[in-house]
Design a protein with these regions (language model features):
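Juxtamembrane helix-loop-helix connectors linking adjacent transmembrane helices
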Residues: 43-74, 93-206
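Alpha-helical transmembrane spans of integral membrane proteins, capturing the lipid-embedded, hydrophobic core
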Residues: 22-26, 78-84, 117, 121-133, ...
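Transmembrane helix-loop-helix hairpins at the membrane interface
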Residues: 155-324
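N-terminal, membrane-interfacial amphipathic/helix-forming hydrophobic leader that caps
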Residues: 1-118, 133, 137, 273-324
Length: 324
């Protein structure tokens, strides 16, 4: 039988090439986001100086339309810098840098995404997009259309999709997955160990992962339901996509930690919409039209190709681990 490392190398060359392209696109999305918020008319009658206290999410609270001086632009920059810091951190660690990780797959057929966060991010992001596309294709063949929530203002919507990953990962991963895992599997109770396990649940000594998988699936279903449960939410067609996405993010958090799940979630929100709004603004077309632009089709094609290779390598790696 052929050397498994040679076969992984064969798949690894196009796979790492695609991951490198995705990495470059992720990097470029950072300045694109700044450009959209501060240099375009995305908000129409409002701009980045719009008070954060006037957002509808604070309606019926004492914070709503208060004198607190903080604008959408201020909070966006804070979020942007936070994501950028985590992004840079993910390139460098936890054990080796991104370039060395992809080089190892090409040169030696060594495949271990745990060595670098960015390797895991680009790989699992591709898998998530691939599965979401398959779900969408199947649902549309049965006449189930996924309709996004109607946003009153594109600037506010872009702000929300930038904020959502941080809030949702804190609630659905750290609180609803991380803490139960610690309660079930921890043999120590120090604060430092608790925080370490919330950051990277794989730090726990988990010999039987059945309970962990149940928690991940249950929270994934709750994550899917949360996307359709409210009046201004997605249509029912989003439930399956969001549920599977929640399960994948939960699994990724369980295996690799909050850095990976957070940045994958960020990419599915900020990254996608940054390119779509950029196309919309420079071509003076609607957001819906922008999503049909050849550039968005090219992005989707890159994701799907990378996702197919990622799944193929996962299957090959598991097969050879069992047989060699």
């Amino acid at each position: 039988m052929q050397n498994p490392n040679k076969i992984l190398q064969l798949f690894g060359i196009p796979f790492t090439a695609l991951l490198s392209v995705l990495f470059g696109l992720l990097v470029i999305s950072f300045p694109i986001g700044i450009y959209i918020v501060f240099e375009t008319d995305i908000g129409d009658d409002i701009n980045y100086d719009y008070p954060i206290t006037h957002l509808d999410i604070f309606h019926d609270t004492n914070f709503y339309q208060s004198s607190f001086e903080l604008s959408i632009g201020d909070v966006f920059v804070i979020l942007w810098m936070f994501y950028l810091a985590i992004f840079v951190f993910s390139i460098l660690g936890p054990k080796q840098n991104f370039l060395k990780s992809i080089s190892s797959l090409i040169s030696m057929g060594i495949y271990d995404v745990k060595l670098n966060y960015m390797f895991a991010i680009t790989k699992w992001l591709s898998v998530l997009v691939l599965i979401s596309a398959l779900i969408n294709f199947i649902q549309e063949s049965f006449g189930i259309i996924t309709v996004p929530p109607l946003g009153d203002n594109n600037l506010i919507q872009f702000f929300y999709v930038s904020l959502a990953p941080l809030l949702e990962e804190f609630v659905f991963r750290i609180i609803l997955v991380g803490i139960p895992l610690f309660v079930l599997y921890s043999s120590r109770s120090s604060l430092r160990y608790f925080l370490k396990c919330l950051w990277t649940p794989s730090s726990l000594n988990i010999l039987d992962s059945k309970k962990a998988i149940f928690i991940i699936i249950f929270v994934g279903i709750a994550f899917g339901f949360a996307h359709i449960a409210f009046g201004d939410s997605w249509s029912e067609g989003k439930f399956a996509q969001a549920t599977v996405g929640g399960i994948i993010l939960g699994w990724v958090y369980f295996r690799y930690g909050i850095v990976v799940s957070l940045l994958i979630h960020w990419a599915t929100n900020y990254f996608i919409f940054a390119y779509a709004y950029f196309i919309s603004q420079i071509n003076y077309v609607s957001l819906e039209t922008a999503f049909s632009h050849p550039l968005m089709f090219t992005l989707e094609l890159i994701f799907l190709s990378s996702g197919i290779l990622a799944v193929s390598i996962l299957i090959l790696n598991r097969f050879y681990l069992k047989n060699f």
